[in-house]
Amino acid sequence: MKRIKLKYRKLKRQQFIKVEKFNIGIDMVECHRWLENKQESIACAKREGNIVLVEKLAQEIVNSSFGRAVAVQTVASSKGSRSPGLSRESFKTNKNYVAMMATLEQITSNPHKYKATPLSRIYIPKRDGSARPLSIPSYTDRCLQALYKLAIEPMAEEVADLSSYGFRPMRNVSWAVGRVLNGLNNPLANYQYVVEIDIKGCVDNINHQFISQVTPFIPKKILWAWLKCGYIERNSNTLQPTTTGVPQGGIISPLIMNLTLDGLEFHIYKKIQKSSSQSKGNTYCRYADDMVILTTTEETALIALPAVKEFLAVRGLEVKLAKTTIKNIINDRNGFEFLSFRFRKVYRRNRKRLTSQVGIPISAIKNFRKNIKAISKTRKSLDTINDEINAVFRDCGYYYRFAHTSGYVFSSLGYWLWKQFYKHCYKRTKDKFDKANHTKINEIVLSSYFKPIGSGLSTKPFVIDKKGKPHSLFSIRSIEYCPPTYTDSARNAFIFEDSVTLTKVNMRSKSSWKRVILEKWGPCCGLCRKNLEINSIPYELHHILPKRFGGKDTPNNMVLLCKSPCHQLVSSSIQKADVSEIQNYISLGILEIPMDYLENLKTSQSSY
């Protein structure tokens, strides 16, 4: 073990908050257009088998200032940009971003001199009481990983398994749920058994030699520097070695994990076809390192499980025996869990035919209620508690909207939260009175924190902050059931024709609003034209005609914009009264301003 002394910078909260908008003097719209064309060319060349052209195009991305700019912007605009790891350099101003681009140019031009910084390791608690290690690379290492990911992800999409949906562009949980549900509903296959597979520490235990074999294009010196850089735990100065696996927290780690597990679907299929089993039908589905295999008979299931173990052993992995099981779906009324959804077969009302059902597990509902109670017990202002509860509610609602039982569960959760909010407000109000009776406190609570909905007796909780802004409690009942959807054809999100098909599939799981907006604008930011689906960029709905000028909440008055910086730039242009910027956004069709207001702005500027 090596003991090294590190000088940790004491970072104040303000240092994380005051981050400059990304503006390095390069047209980022042009950067993304150039990058998308290069990535499409790489994907097409890979499909045609032209490896020489693939490597040439990938090298152009790595060597280009456009590629470096997109990589730095990806890290700077991500949520993890506030976590420095063991970085000693600052990464919050445009001057820092330009310096990082110069550093990337030096590393890529001479990779043999590159040395990765040790990882900063923290532990995140899991549901079962254990802890998941999260290793955070330095800013330089993250930007370098983002740069090489831009080059190799189009290649990886061409060799990916058809039924792999985790950490892939334009794929999501809906696809995995739809794949399993479609298999269970197949009357010809009549699947009765499921093999639930849980890999033991998948990301942390992959063999480094195997990673080196399956990862294309990245120089071996750089790849091995990432794998062998070691880690330092928080509140410790001891450098621990990394002998296996990739860091959980690295930008390129999910892609490397997918490259490692790709090929498992064909391996299982080949083993079952070569067996003497009379029924060879099976359906495979994988999301990251979680996977299930549906089979018609127990004999086929007993063939599939050893095939998985054999495939994983070559990669230095093994299954967790405690969580790897073979179940009979028909006899087991509880069914099986996959991605926190419960799948089972139930009889229809006529009791003659089995049908498949996707539900929300009771354990997930209990954990959700536990989190809400923990938030409500904190000593924070009511509007802050309200906003935190809304964030949890939205995440839960939009994740589980693919479950058949979502309507019933959301309705009961909404009523439960109404009661929790009432109890919390009642306790806070009761302390302000010495001998007030229940009726008086109840009247004060209902008049202060609840507003009536329509002409009925229903009320909606809301809180007014110190600035007089109302914060209403999100209604989870407003989230409608959305049927899961997927396609089993080989589609590469980086090829335009394929991305159009994938967008149409994803639109089926969107609300009617988003469907209309996507049909009009496509899955791109209205300002920078960045593909939001491929790059998994957080976006917001922007009112083309702002509400202050009479704009309405209708799909035709909405456009998708990157959360940062595009939406901030468009909104701030009105506040700053910048006529040139406003006219530019009007010409792009993402902003409408009344003519008299615009004329007044021009007049006021000319008077100065």
Swiss-Prot record:
GO terms for cellular component: chloroplast. Its EC number is 2.7.7.49. It is found in: Plastid, Chloroplast. Coiled coil: none annotated. One of its GO terms (molecular function) is RNA-directed DNA polymerase activity. It is an enzyme of class 2 (transferase). Gene3D superfamilies: 1.10.30.50. Residues 105-343 form the Reverse transcriptase domain. It catalyses: DNA(n) + a 2'-deoxyribonucleoside 5'-triphosphate = DNA(n+1) + diphosphate. InterPro entries: DNA/RNA_pol_sf, GrpII_Intron_Splice-Mob/Def, HNH, HNH_nuc, RT_dom, RVT_N. SUPFAM superfamilies: DNA/RNA polymerases (SSF56672). Pfam families: HNH, RVT_1, RVT_N. The keyword Plastid applies. Residues 525-571 form the HNH domain. Keywords: Chloroplast, Nucleotidyltransferase, Plastid, RNA-directed DNA polymerase, Transferase. This is Probable reverse transcriptase. It comes from Tetradesmus obliquus.
